[in-house]
């Protein structure tokens, strides 16, 4: 599973993306546990981050498959 980081999340993780070795689908809670185990600094951002899977926003009950591309989307504003 490839996980992408954007904006200040890149700073928190010191990388643009990471490959997670997973053998079976993960729920969002399991995914967060795996990410926080590797990048504890993400804990400060969790409440404001949306998950996206294969370029579409994910709902909280979604399962993420081993071959998915997951993105952590920080708050976005525009004008």
Regions from the PLM with identified roles:
Residues 1-78:
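Ubiquitin-like/PB1-type beta-grasp interaction modules and other compact soluble beta-rich domains
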